[in-house]
Amino acid sequence: MQLNPSEISDLIKSRIQNLQLAATSRNEGTVVSVTDGITRVHGLADVMQGEMLEFPGNTFGLALNLERDSVGAVVLGEYEHITEGDPVKATGRILEVPVGPELIGRVVNALGQPIDGKGPINAKLTDKIEKVAPGVIWRQSVSQPVQTGLKSVDAMVPIGRGQRELIIGDRQTGKTAVAVDAIINQKGQDMFCVYVAIGQKASTIANVVRKLEEHGAMEYTIVVAATASESAAMQFIAPYSGCTMGEYFRDRGQDALIIYDDLTKQAWAYRQISLLLRRPPGREAYPGDVFYLHSRLLERASRVSADHVEKFTNGEVKGKTGSLTALPIIETQAGDVSAFVPTNVISITDGQIFLDTDLFNAGIRPAINAGISVSRVGGAAQTKVIKKLSGGIRTDLAQYRELAAFAQFASDLDDATRKQLERGRRVTELMKQPQYAPLSVADMAITLYAVNNGYFDDVEVPRLLAFESGLQQYVKAKNPALVTKIMTSKELDADGEKQLVAVIDEFKKSWA
């Protein structure tokens, strides 16, 4: 069969007209260099700050440096398989992590992936790790307490729901112990907890998880772990991931407590990333925005109004306020609270619990230094009975420390000074508390009432804690109705006081 030229041209024209090409537009670049988990990517246009980039092998990275002709990105996870010339795709999405009640009782990494070997987490929702903190209009003042179960904290530096209270001290002073005790004491308090472990040994995190399981605390706790063996990028994003998981409860009219253990290691990880990205170093080689690193995280902890909750849930939850309470931990070097990161976080938070090495070594645990520990907003949230009974405790301790230092040089002391020293010695002893043994409000009220009214004054110091424990058990056995009344009303009225005095007097007679 032969075709003439006109037929051939008609055939070609019809083919061209009927040609359909499926064109897909894709923002793609090429890896120029890979060093220590940092990649430089050339050819990516329209990339957002913090956008997720997709590398070969189902690996993702975060775009952190947006420069004129390249993008500096940090790889989340393993980067050994990424080589120069590999294609990189922009996803157009900001990093999100799974949120919701499905995560409760699980141990996850900074990306919300389970690492506890208990199978997948079928979370229905995800949320961005970087979010804007609630505005002033949507906040409410702190007025409800977070009971830690520690006498020295609840009496001297009370914490309220929605507060940010810093726990600061040298290594091995019991910072994590205070935080873990606070989590254990939330059992039955209608509070969800998130424990974020940053840059710690995997064995240390496993110990904390085991203790939480032993005390039944994993029933309301999520553990986010970025271990020391993980990349700096994972340690940097872990607190933001944990915060997003906590905000899920806050924005739905529930209460949550988040512990960042510790933010010093997050600052180190961020410093490492920034130096590798060739950002100019500042004080202590930290980048210029290290204050913003922590302020944007800690400002997300707040108590939000019922209007915020109603708006967020589209009217499903009405008349309930939500809160996210943060307990960030900072590790100091040789007690230097004037270093860069400690001063930053002190200025951001609503108070600090300072743990002292000397007190810890002297056996006073928790080793809280009453002189420089403070809670700027917690007083308004303190339980009524504890507030009423704890007034003189802090002053007694602070004055005792000063007098004790002075008394070392003075040979003869007047009666008033000797009396004050004796009282200070007893109050110091009574503030001691074993780990994983948080006290109820009623137990605390019994101890504080007894110490304020001189019932411990004639008990020898070594026997004080045994006397205190015996007294608490005796009151519970002899007058359970009074204990229940204190627990429910959170107050000690004149009638309750009369009953308590009678029981304490009875106990003192039987105590030998």
Curated annotation (Swiss-Prot):
Keywords: ATP synthesis, ATP-binding, Cell inner membrane, Cell membrane, CF(1), Hydrogen ion transport, Ion transport, Membrane, Nucleotide-binding, Translocase, Transport
A single MF term (Gene Ontology): proton-transporting ATP synthase activity, rotational mechanism
Subcellular location: Cell inner membrane
GO cellular component: plasma membrane; proton-transporting ATP synthase complex
Reaction(s) this enzyme catalyzes, per UniProt: ATP + H2O + 4 H(+)(in) = ADP + phosphate + 5 H(+)(out)
Key word Translocase present: yes
Site, Required for activity: residue positions: 373
Keyword Transferase: no
Assembly: F-type ATPases have 2 components, CF(1) - the catalytic core - and CF(0) - the membrane proton channel. CF(1) has five subunits: alpha(3), beta(3), gamma(1), delta(1), epsilon(1). CF(0) has three main subunits: a(1), b(2) and c(9-12). The alpha and beta chains form an alternating ring which encloses part of the gamma chain. CF(1) is attached to CF(0) by a central stalk formed by the gamma and epsilon chains, while a peripheral stalk is formed by the delta and b chains.
The protein's name: ATP synthase subunit alpha
Organism: Aromatoleum aromaticum (strain DSM 19018 / LMG 30748 / EbN1) (Azoarcus sp. (strain EbN1))
Lineage: Bacteria, Pseudomonadati, Pseudomonadota, Betaproteobacteria, Rhodocyclales
Gene (name only): atpA
